[in-house]
């Protein structure tokens, strides 16, 4: 292999290591068995939610993870591997939610493991995380809870006003 090709690959590994270092959530999956259309749809949904998906040789993944200071994921870099990651600190549950949905829809996807905010995470923890509502969901629940007492008070005032109108009409 030429020195230029080796330098190019090292440059790629270094760039990917920087992306992994900045990532708040990293998921490692086996995607073998998905059609091109299914992978394309999953990538689009991930991209729409500020999440990236890359399919990279396992050797490069190991090197990039080592350069990024990520330990414990080496055993997941076996077989067909895709890395799904985001640097969006606002919602680290989004990658887990999307991948979990696709895993439920297509039996061929397998979550191998991951890392969330620097902590090694198992497949079961990722599935559990996927069931937690995202930032927008939590905010809408909070707004609903805050509005409930005001709404109930408004209904009570309206009911009292209507009953007084009925009493005065009689």
Swiss-Prot record:
Q: What is the recorded name of this protein?
A: Large ribosomal subunit protein uL10
The record's GO molecular-function terms, alphabetically, read: large ribosomal subunit rRNA binding; structural constituent of ribosome
Q: Which UniProt keywords apply?
A: Ribonucleoprotein, Ribosomal protein, RNA-binding, rRNA-binding
The entry sums up its family as follows: Belongs to the universal ribosomal protein uL10 family.
> What PANTHER family is this protein classified in?
39S RIBOSOMAL PROTEIN L10, MITOCHONDRIAL
- Role of this protein: Forms part of the ribosomal stalk, playing a central role in the interaction of the ribosome with GTP-bound translation factors.
Pfam annotation, one family: Ribosomal_L10
Organism equals Lactobacillus helveticus (strain DPC 4571)
Q: Which gene encodes it?
A: rplJ
* Complex formation: Part of the ribosomal stalk of the 50S ribosomal subunit. The N-terminus interacts with L11 and the large rRNA to form the base of the stalk. The C-terminus forms an elongated spine to which L12 dimers bind in a sequential fashion forming a multimeric L10(L12)X complex.
- Please give the InterPro entries that the UniProt record associates with this protein: Ribosomal_uL10 (IPR001790), Ribosomal_uL10-like_sf (IPR043141), Ribosomal_uL10_bac (IPR022973), Ribosomal_uL10_bac_type (IPR047865), Ribosomal_uL10_CS_bac (IPR002363)
A single GO cellular-component term from the record reads: large ribosomal subunit
